[in-house]
């Protein structure tokens, strides 16, 4: 029997403006050093920038971006007979959105614009339109899963 304690999942309250748990998680991922007010300001300012520049609903753009970047497959490393295989596995919804938000934030922070507000606004808009670095990351993950399709019979769920 495992002695390891499984951490309970924390209840994340929805954000104040759009009443969305997904957006609240995204804000939490943006947050650095516990400065949630700064993270909220960055996200909401980016939403305002999207609305002014492209005249589209920023919340709908955010949802489209998250849905477009969310991966359906990923590879996990499985050891079989002394060899490690990259086995494609399905990504559950919660992990998919967590990966999507991480990829969007990383892609935004590496952009050339000066302020994070501008970087995030542009990356979200591009991801909503199936362009950008975050979408490329998802496509690379899917290509890797497709390339290792031959090892899918080593699926970790079947091994147990």
UniProtKB/Swiss-Prot annotation:
What is this protein's gene name? Answer: rpsG
Name this protein carries in UniProt: Small ribosomal subunit protein uS7
Q: Report the PROSITE patterns cross-referenced here.
A: RIBOSOMAL_S7 (PS00052)
Please give the superkingdom of this protein's source: Bacteria
The record's note on quaternary structure and interaction partners says:
Part of the 30S ribosomal subunit. Contacts proteins S9 and S11.
Check the UniProt entry and state the signal peptide residues, or none.
Answer: none
One GO molecular-function entry: structural constituent of ribosome
Annotated organism of origin? Rickettsia typhi (strain ATCC VR-144 / Wilmington)
GO terms of biological process kind: translation
Which keywords accompany this UniProt record?
Ribonucleoprotein, Ribosomal protein, RNA-binding, rRNA-binding, tRNA-binding
Q: Which SUPFAM superfamilies match?
A: Ribosomal protein S7
Entry's family note: Belongs to the universal ribosomal protein uS7 family.
Q: Which purpose does this protein serve, as stated in its record?
A: One of the primary rRNA binding proteins, it binds directly to 16S rRNA where it nucleates assembly of the head domain of the 30S subunit. Is located at the subunit interface close to the decoding center, probably blocks exit of the E-site tRNA.
